[in-house]
Design a protein with these regions (language model features):
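Conserved SAM/SAH-binding loop
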Residues: 218-223
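Residue-level preference for short coil/turn positions at secondary-structure junctions
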Residues: 26, 212, 228-229
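Conserved proline-anchored active-site loop of SAM-dependent methyltransferases
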Residues: 16, 30-44, 53-58, 226-247
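S-adenosyl-L-methionine
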Residues: 1-34, 39-47, 60-63, 69-70, ...
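Short, conserved, surface-exposed binding loops centered on an aromatic residue
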Residues: 208, 224-227
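Class I S-adenosyl-L-methionine-dependent methyltransferase module
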Residues: 50, 57, 61-205, 241, ...
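A short helix-to-beta-strand connector/capping loop
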Residues: 207-215
Length: 289
């Protein structure tokens, strides 16, 4: 399943990279100021560019870390030692595969996602339940989220490992979310995809000994642009007025690992701190300055 994301460049990646290569030779530094799902940044790394990836959203930050900052397969040394006392660690599997297997078997719980985003829930700020996930998948999300948060708090995960697991969780949730395309609202009935079981999968990591060449930043493009030195800057601003912070609020909550107030029928998190002027007709010109 592909990443359901507005403005994804998967289908035009060769055109974009082709134009970049005309303007900047391989091994040059390219800034991807609004990196989104990281498709362009990843392809640039494959072609031996030095990449600076920036985006406002936390989920994008984790995607870029995973795409740009792995030189070898993760060994999850502390986590494997921790879970070996109560979970079967299979010698025929890699440490990463064992960790994903462990997370897929975490005990579900009725927590924040089940209460706020499933049809069995009783949301605090809505008269009716929201239908973003099946009750079973929402409980799985709650169980896995709690485990990842606890492992992070106990320093059992490195920052790199945490980003990888959050990336995997976001990708798995996006596959089975009961949405038409964005998280601005849910579909009234659970469709076939939403009825399938949440299942984390190992990411096919791009492993290269070039991680020192790449920089990952999070913040407003207008503010971070002046901090970046590069040979070419690739800017892919939003094409419409819909704010990414609102339309992908659930992915942002998964990335942050928090439990924000879910507001209104759609259960939006407070997102004004990630409001983009590039989505506003009256402000976009000043943002480019």
């Amino acid at each position: 399943m592909g990443y359901r994301y507005i403005g994804s460049k998967v289908k035009v990646i060769d055109n974009v990279i082709g134009k970049i290569s005309e303007l900047c030779p391989s091994k040059g530094r390219v800034a991807d100021l609004m990196s989104g799902t990281g498709v362009i940044s990843t392809e640039l790394r494959k072609r031996d560019y030095k990449v600076t990836a920036n985006d406002l959203m936390t989920y994008s930050y984790h995607h870029s870390i995973v795409n740009l900052k792995f030189s070898s397969a993760p060994n999850f040394e502390k986590l494997i030692a921790f879970i070996s006392d109560f979970h079967e660690v299979k010698p025929e599997l890699s440490p990463y595969e064992n960790v994903i297997n462990f997370l897929n078997n975490v005990k579900p719980k009725c927590g924040y996602f089940w209460n706020e985003f499933s049809c069995e829930g009783n949301p605090q700020n809505s008269e009716r339940p929201r239908n973003y996930f099946s009750p079973e998948n929402a409980r799985k999300l709650d169980g896995i989220r709690e485990v990842i948060n606890n492992l992070s708090c106990d320093n059992i995960l490195t920052d790199l490992e945490r980003s990888l697991l959050l990336h995997d969780l976001i990708m798995a949730a996006n596959d089975i979310a009961n949405i038409a395309g964005t998280y601005g609202h849910y579909m009234s009935r659970l469709n076939g995809r939403a009825l399938t079981q949440l299942n984390l999968k190992c990411t096919d990591l791009l492993l290269k000994s070039d991680v020192e060449n790449h920089i990952v930043m999070q913040g407003y493009a207008e503010e971070n642009a002046s901090k970046i030195q590069c040979d070419l800057c690739y800017i892919d601003p939003p094409y419409m007025k819909r704010q990414y912070a609102a339309n992908y609020h659930i992915l942002e909550t998964l990335a942050r690992g928090d439990e924000p107030e879910a507001i209104g029928i759609s259960g939006l998190r407070p997102w004004r701190d990630q409001y983009s002027n590039f989505c506003t007709k009256t402000k976009i010109r000043d943002s480019f300055k």
